[in-house]
Amino acid sequence: MNKEIEKLLFNPIRLKTISFLMTVETCTFKSLLDVTDSTKGNLSIQLKKLNEAGLIKIEKYFQKSYPTTDYSITKKGKKSFEEFYNQLLSYK
């Protein structure tokens, strides 16, 4: 596993985010706030890092004249999470 990706996933907020995104197709910022129990500012920073690493996808659009942002996990994100999870299981 890439050491940079491993380092990214050891952060509790990023790990909760990736774990949750593995279970849903897309979600909103509000959903991620609830799941991670984080502040808006901190979550925004962590999402930016995950996006820059190519682990998540951020889509912004307007819905009924209101700005909306959806988050989803990428193929790279799924693969990285699975490798990270399996690596943790191997430390028995």
Can you name each region flagged by the protein language model?
Residues K16, F20, L55-K57, K76:
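Solvent-exposed, amphipathic alpha-helical segments
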Residues N51-Y66, S72:
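Beta-hairpin "wing" of winged helix-turn-helix
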Residues L47-K48:
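Short, hydrophobic-biased segments on the C-terminal half of alpha helices
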